[in-house]
């Protein structure tokens, strides 16, 4: 049996990150070019390491004179004083300053299991090993900061970091199919009932909700109206998943007979989700570029 605890720091902040610098330039004052100085970079003088406190408990078990070995481990780590590029007003001359998010915490916890076996019979030797790992990532607190958004392709928000969820969860609208000719007819009926961009109280949509009633066509994506207000807005974005797998695993084996040997290793992960941006470009129906033929279906 074994147990351990440790405190480590992430110092990936570069040298002199706490030191602001001055910039120099010239300006014309009367008939003379004068030299001027201003603060060129903004720094947090109190910036420090991002810290991670972690404990582990586990066991190592050997059976049958060491021919079968079992290894198990449980870990729980808490990272705090997270490093973050805090946005600041652009009138300051900079767009962000690297700092520690006070009271912000991220937890990683999980288990690892491994089993090893050996067969030794004369000139024949065979070793096989299998392992499985499960990790859970969770933002415990953002230290009073609102949701952190990541903007990706076409300046679209695609990820969000939010308390209670894994870091960088996928975030966006839910597609419910394609707008048909019948949908379009009903949408135009709904459009005729709009008053100053809103529907009268109690009005029931005939067609699907759309983001812009003045720019909609058959074949456009039909988005889910999550808040049921009859319009597709930013409030209809939902958590779509995350890139963390349910578990990862691996198997390795090697055997030998006299002067012949063979080795093989297999690794994999299960349950991870991805954003297919290649599919986005081939199905987005924007501009005059080529699209996959199946898009017409």
Segment roles from a protein language model:
Residues 1-165:
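Extracellular/periplasmic, surface-exposed regions of secreted and cell-surface proteins
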Residues 12-13, 171, 182-183, 263-265, ...:
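Short helix/loop capping segments that flank catalytic or ligand/cofactor-binding pockets
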Residues 79, 136-138, 216, 256-297:
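C-terminal beta-signal and adjacent terminal beta-strands/loops
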Residues 120-241, 281-285, 290-295:
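Conserved small-residue
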Residues 244-245:
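Extracellular/lumenal carbohydrate-interaction signature centered on repeated Trp-anchored short motifs
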């Amino acid at each position: 049996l074994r147990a351990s605890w440790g405190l480590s720091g992430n110092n990936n902040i570069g040298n002199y990150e706490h030191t602001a610098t001055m910039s120099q330039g010239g300006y014309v004052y009367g008939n003379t070019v004068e030299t001027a100085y201003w603060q060129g970079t903004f720094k947090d003088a109190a910036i420090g390491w991002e810290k991670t406190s972690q404990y582990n408990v586990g066991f190592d078990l050997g059976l049958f004179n060491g021919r079968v070995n079992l290894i198990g481990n449980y870990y729980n780590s808490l990272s705090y004083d997270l490093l973050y590029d805090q946005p600041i007003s652009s009138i300051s001359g900079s767009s962000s300053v690297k700092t520690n998010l006070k009271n912000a915490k991220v937890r990683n916890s999980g288990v690892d299991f491994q089993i090893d076996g050996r067969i030794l019979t004369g000139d024949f030797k065979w070793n096989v090993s299998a392992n499985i790992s499960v990790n859970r990532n969770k933002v415990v607190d953002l230290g009073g900061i609102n949701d952190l958004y990541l903007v990706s392709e076409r300046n679209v928000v695609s990820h969000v970091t939010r308390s209670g969820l894994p870091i960088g969860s996928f975030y966006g609208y839910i597609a419910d199919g394609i707008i048909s000719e019948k949908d379009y007819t009903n949408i135009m009926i709904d459009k005729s009932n709009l008053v100053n961009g809103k529907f009268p109280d109690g009005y029931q949509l005939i067609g699907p909700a759309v983001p812009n009633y003045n720019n909609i066509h058959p074949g456009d994506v039909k988005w889910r109206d999550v808040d049921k207000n009859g319009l597709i807005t930013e409030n209809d974005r939902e958590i779509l998943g995350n890139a963390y797998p349910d578990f990862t695993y691996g198997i390795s084996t090697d055997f030998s007979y006299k002067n012949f040997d063979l080795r093989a290793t297999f690794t994999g992960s299960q349950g991870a989700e991805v954003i297919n941006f290649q599919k986005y470009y081939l199905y987005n129906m924007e501009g005059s570029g080529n699209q996959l033929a199946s898009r017409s279906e």
